[in-house]
């Protein structure tokens, strides 16, 4: 399995071999940890990861799209081939791929990622959920139970590369 940047670069290598000038690729990874609490007890813990790569090919004004959830060289080559074949099935349209701007700001300046959040584990999220439950009950004596309480931690990593020199990555995370 290739890393995200290797996978995107592999698509651009395949496009160069075929002589395509206008190709872009997006790779995205999402991780989440979700805790459900009911009546001061953990009822459910779910952890999930999703990964995907999308390819857009412009061939003589025709746009072809394809994707894969596997970052193996074979799966990426198959997705690229599908995008090329899908382009042949489309009517030509006016689409312009933009060249890379002179400067793309570093996404870290957006403040979307806090590495400390990725360290929160099941126990930390459970403690947070239970403290929220206690705080709500303490705030109003009429609250006798909370039928559903969920706490989750998620992180996202995105990468965009194009045959025109665009290279942009962004990382974000949250606790909700």
Predicted regions and their residues:
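Active-site bordering "gate/hinge" segments
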Residues: 1-176
């Amino acid at each position: 399995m290739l890393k995200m940047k290797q996978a995107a670069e592999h698509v651009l290598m395949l496009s160069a071999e075929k002589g395509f000038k206008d190709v872009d690729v997006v790779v995205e990874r999402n991780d989440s940890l979700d805790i459900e609490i009911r009546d001061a007890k953990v009822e459910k813990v779910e952890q999930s990861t999703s990964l995907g790569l999308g390819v857009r090919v412009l061939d003589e004004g025709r746009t072809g799209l394809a994707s894969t959830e596997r970052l193996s060289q074979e799966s990426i080559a198959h997705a690229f081939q599908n995008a090329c074949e899908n382009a042949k099935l489309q009517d030509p349209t006016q689409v312009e791929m933009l060249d890379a701007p002179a400067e793309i700001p570093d996404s870290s300046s957006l403040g979307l990622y806090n590495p400390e959040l990725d360290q929160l584990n099941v126990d930390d999220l459970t403690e947070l959920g239970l403290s929220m439950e206690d705080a709500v009950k303490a705030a109003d004596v009429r609250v006798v139970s909370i039928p559903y309480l969920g706490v989750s931690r998620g992180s996202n990593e995105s990468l965009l590369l194009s045959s025109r020199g665009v290279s942009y990555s962004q990382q974000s995370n949250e606790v909700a």
